[in-house]
């Protein structure tokens, strides 16, 4: 009898194997996706991530309230549903109902309290997160970033209800803030257990669709497998994602050999968005820079094409302060919809220099004697930007006769000097932490603590205030457009370049989602023949 049963079992297994082979299916086959990215992954802590590669990994090993679709709209993720209510004082309350079937990778339930903890931790000055201003629209933010984190208006009435109060209307809150890597939930127990909780397979706890497997000490290769306990695991595309981190030259050579290359790809690469822009700050408190004509002249003679090439091959000359990849409230690309505010055409450079010289004369600087009244003009910059600084110095002296001294410092000193207003001219990079034009325009309001240029422009403040309170998406887009134009014309904040993200995706690979700011999600990828 036992022999008969064994024979029957073997026969059944053989039949199943033949049947699966006939259908072209192998139960041992994994749906694999191979991805090469430039950059590094030093952390998987949502509050600490700063590179495109880090944000991409976090999008897979954690899950936020919402997740972006390929068309840029937001789909429900940890949140089953949400409601929105506007109070008489203009504040807006979002109430999210969370999934009850979501689990952390240690098997415990993901709750609303995890979001409260994560968001307050994000803005806590002790966390020292580079992404804290991602929550600047939440009521109580200004008190929270000074240390009173409980002032941040995010609460959990029960385990599966999350309430967030915003200071005012924020059209991008759902589609950008609630999908961001920085605002992912984190488990307080995991964070408290070990200082390197996000970098160790022993201590890491995530709630995402994928989990990191393999050798965690290998910083050049990350292997992600679907997490069996994920609530929507059956709808995932790849079973396994192999993410290789390479330098630019190696990544370029990988195009066509792997499914997706991000941050490289050679001449055939498409150009995606990157959240970083390079700017020249003119300190409004510096008396020598008081003439708007002088500031405009400094801006006009800058050869931005050369400056961008000097910074790196993944840079383009700035056409405004808001870079490509940032969307309007209506879903268009802000830069494309509003056009270029800065002329970078090489054929008109000579004409622009003549215009700059005319502006200088209007400001009263007609000869070497009058120019000497400027006294010492110093350009402060991070030492890594020395070539760009020298280029600007040469342009200002050769085209305008203005001599500028250069002062290169370490990045930590640059930050301190900017915060204290100890500069006349300074080079800096600004990185937006959410996909909206206000991420680049808000910092230059008179009351904003990030207003290093100490710009006090009443008309600009009014435009930004009206935009923030506008209930019309069309009107808000128009106000932001006008505010950017005014900012560029005033020339205290002078855009120089914006970074871009090249990428190559095989034709048969569909469903990769970019947030327009460098991070990607591959959980919905499928292959088509």
Where are these regions (language model features)?
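N-terminal lobe/hinge region of extracytoplasmic solute-binding protein
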Residues: 36-87, 205
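Aromatic- and charge-enriched surface segment that lines or borders ligand/interaction sites
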Residues: 81-134, 163, 288-290
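Gly/Pro-rich hinge or "lid" segments in bacterial periplasmic/extracellular proteins
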Residues: 149, 169-240, 247-248
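Detector for C-terminal structural segments
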Residues: 301-332, 384-393, 419-529
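Ligand/substrate-recognition segments at binding pockets and active sites
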Residues: 217-219, 349-353, 357-432
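Structural transition elements
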Residues: 315-362, 381-386
């Amino acid at each position: 009898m036992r022999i008969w049963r064994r024979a029957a079992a073997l026969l059944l297994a053989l039949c199943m194997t033949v049947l699966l082979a006939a259908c072209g299916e192998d139960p041992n086959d994994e749906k694999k996706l191979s991805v090469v990215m430039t950059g590094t992954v030093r952390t998987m802590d949502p509050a600490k991530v700063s590179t495109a590669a880090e944000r991409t990994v976090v999008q897979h090993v954690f899950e936020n309230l919402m997740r972006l679709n390929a068309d840029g709209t937001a789909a429900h993720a940890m949140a089953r549903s949400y409601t929105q209510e506007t109070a008489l004082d203009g504040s807006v309350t979002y109430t999210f109902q969370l999934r009850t079937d979501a689990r952390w990778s240690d098997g415990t339930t993901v709750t609303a309290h995890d979001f409260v903890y994560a968001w307050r931790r994000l803005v806590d000055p002790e966390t020292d997160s580079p992404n804290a201003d991602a929550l600047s629209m939440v009521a109580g933010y200004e008190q929270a970033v000074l240390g009173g984190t409980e002032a941040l208006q995010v609460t959990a009435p029960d385990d599966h209800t999350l309430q967030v109060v915003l200071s005012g209307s924020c059209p991008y809150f759902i589609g950008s803030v609630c999908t961001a890597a920085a605002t992912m939930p984190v488990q307080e127990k995991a964070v408290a257990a070990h200082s390197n909780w996000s970098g160790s397979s022993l201590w890491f706890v995530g709630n995402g669709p994928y989990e990191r497997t393999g050798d965690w000490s290998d910083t050049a290769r990350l292997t992600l497998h679907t997490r069996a306990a994920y609530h929507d695991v059956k709808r995932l595309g790849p079973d396994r994602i192999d993410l290789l981190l390479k330098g630019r030259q190696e990544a370029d050579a990988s195009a066509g050999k792997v499914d997706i290359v991000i941050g490289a790809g050679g001449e055939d690469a498409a150009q995606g968005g990157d959240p970083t822009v390079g700017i020249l700050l003119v300190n409004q408190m510096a008396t020598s820079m008081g003439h708007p004509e002088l500031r405009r002249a400094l801006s006009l003679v800058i050869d931005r094409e050369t400056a961008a090439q000097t910074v790196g091959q993944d840079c383009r000359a700035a056409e405004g302060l808001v870079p490509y990849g940032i969307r309007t409230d209506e879903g268009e690309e802000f830069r494309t919809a509003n056009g270029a505010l800065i002329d970078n055409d090489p054929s008109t450079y000579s004409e622009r220099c003549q215009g700059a010289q005319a502006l200088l004369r209007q400001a009263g600087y007609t000869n070497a004697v009058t120019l000497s009244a400027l006294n010492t003009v110093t350009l402060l910059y991070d030492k890594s930007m020395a070539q760009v600084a020298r280029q600007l110095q040469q342009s200002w002296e050769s085209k305008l006769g203005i001599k500028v001294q250069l002062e290169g410092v370490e990045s930590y000193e640059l930050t301190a000097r900017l915060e204290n207003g100890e500069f006349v001219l300074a080079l800096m990079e600004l990185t937006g932490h959410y996909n909206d034009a206000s991420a680049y325009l808000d910092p230059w309001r008179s009351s904003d603590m990030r207003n290093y240029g100490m710009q006090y422009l009443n008309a600009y403040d009014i435009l930004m205030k009206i935009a923030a309170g506008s209930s019309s998406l069309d009107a808000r887009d128009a106000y932001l457009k006008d505010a950017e134009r005014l900012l560029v014309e005033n020339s205290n904040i002078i855009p120089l370049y914006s970074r871009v993200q090249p990428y190559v995706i095989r034709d048969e690979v569909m469903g990769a989602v970019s947030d327009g700011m460098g991070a990607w999600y591959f959980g919905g990828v499928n292959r088509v023949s």
